[in-house]
A protein has these predicted regions:
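Phosphate/dinucleotide-binding and metal-coordinating scaffold of catalytic cores
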Residues: 1-225
Length: 225
């Protein structure tokens, strides 16, 4: 895979237009071989060797090649960057691949229960869109509609929230994280909005993504700066 477009767009900042994803890479309209990208791209992937190995086996790539993995799961990453395979690039740029797949309450509850014991269960092979979330805790990324419903987005449409169920290794982490984020906001610090949600018999923390903004054209990805 070559990286044909590796840019972010800073929304609402002084500098507008394309900027390099990495400060030491100049902006060029050329294809760069994936092998030339440093291991820092691995920071966009989950912190789970087991999960990365399973993805590598599923997509027939090396678990040590972050760009190869992101080419399959990186259409929705942190910030404004998207990793899009060359055969899908035209459809993504034109909006042809834009989709929103509604999820029922029961489906979300099942996903939250499954991902507690198996991080790879966050997505199925037939799901629209693909996301990659950094960190060690199991989580899923979804788009929340204005009516409170949830959807899987694809193409140019980004996820807006991250849902994390409780983990056996972190007792009470939902209450703790919600409290800490609310406390930070109360004392004037910049912090993401979070709340505890119950979906049937499944609990999770719902965190509104700080790298997504609402515009007249809908939800947009924003550079995490």
């Amino acid at each position: 895979m070559g990286i044909q477009r590796s840019v972010t767009r800073t929304v609402g900042a002084r500098r507008r237009g394309p900027i390099p994803c990495l400060s030491h890479f100049r902006w060029r309209r050329t294809v760069r071989p994936a092998r030339r990208y440093p291991q820092c791209c691995g920071g966009l992937l989950p912190d789970s060797e087991t999960l990365l190995q399973r993805w590598a086996s599923r997509f027939h790539v090396s678990a040590r090649n972050p760009v190869a993995l992101l080419s399959h799961v990186g259409e929705d990453c942190a910030g404004a960057v998207q990793f899009v395979r060359s055969e899908r690039l035209a459809a993504v740029l034109s909006g042809e691949s834009d989709r929103q797949e509604p999820l029922s309450t029961h489906e979300i509850a099942q996903r939250l229960q499954r991902v507690r014991v198996d991080q790879a269960a966050a997505r199925r092979l037939d799901d629209v869109g693909q996301f990659s979330l950094a960190g060690a805790q199991a989580k899923i990324a979804l788009l929340q509609r204005d009516d409170g419903g949830w959807e899987f987005p694809a193409g140019r449409i980004p996820t807006t929230h991250i849902l994390k169920p409780p983990s056996g290794d972190y007792d009470g982490f939902i209450e703790n994280e919600v409290f800490c984020l609310h406390l930070a906001r109360h004392v004037g610090m910049s912090a993401a909005f979070a709340e505890m949600i119950c979906v049937e018999d499944a609990q999770a923390i719902s965190v509104r993504r700080y790298d997504r903004i609402r515009t007249a054209a809908g939800w947009q990805r924003a550079a995490a700066v």
